[in-house]
């Protein structure tokens, strides 16, 4: 008897057959091979989109070129994806801690850019605006960063510069706009690389007014307070190469649902520590059950291969990584006596024992996942923003009898 958690597992081995699409994308050995018909493929696509939390198939406005990752935001997000995937593989937490324990990471490319540069009254500034309409509801922002690339400035030699970032709160027609301070970074004019400014404080406004973002404004000053054109300071904008264009990256975590505390009808007693359900040796009862065997010819409960190929689903125009992943599923016999290799719970042992005595009244224990892990998917949404989402409980790590 087999158990498969969630809608994805209802697809069974059909997904495994999707994995033979191209070089380097073959499913692991042992996967049955069968091509799905058009209707089956649509059903599979719909089920997987539901598991991924997507209402429909994203359709980026301009599919990326063959290189797939020419721009700054996707390149940065791919690095995050590898960090998150490496964390999952090693069952550790360093990458998760670096990502602020985020379930979802979104990047927003600069859509509109305005300058008050040379030839205008001081102070000089550069303003950036982003399409924030795709920010999801029900998610809490844990961090937000503005990233802009800096090249060495040949105009300011090696002077010290102060770069400050403000949120535009209210635009004024007859005076300077109302601004809210976000962050300040100090650097040398000869420095080169990505400058990161913390804009987390602006995230509350983004969540409340997604359709009325007035942008972020960047100022540069010397140590003596003289205003400097950001372009002369080496800060690149929309005209920079695609791999060096500015963008915002925002980290989200799903807001926890409120937990209702049950009302106690009597004073609570101190509970004894729970004992582990893991058994150090085979679960065998001596005596009359020694000769009992499971169903002949059936494999014991264990993990089997289930491969999901985004390539053969026709999704590589919006899925950046991975091109496929092994989800696995649990199947096999849970017959008495249950060996230690079956990872059986005490309840499963008892249920199997009663099943021997009353097979028509009590079913066998079920083969089901005992440990699940997350998988991450990096993709474009319909607005060409790059999304990195961690989906929990997507990969079976171990199976057992329940």
UniProtKB/Swiss-Prot annotation:
Disulfide cysteine pairs (residue numbers): 301-367, 330-399, 334-401
GO BP terms: cartilage development; cell differentiation; diet induced thermogenesis; energy homeostasis; negative regulation of insulin secretion; ossification
UniProt superkingdom: Eukaryota
One GO MF term attached to the UniProt entry: growth factor activity
Keywords assigned: Chondrogenesis, Cytokine, Developmental protein, Differentiation, Disulfide bond, Glycoprotein, Growth factor, Osteogenesis, Secreted, Signal
Similarity annotation: Belongs to the TGF-beta family.
Protein name, entry field: Bone morphogenetic protein 8A
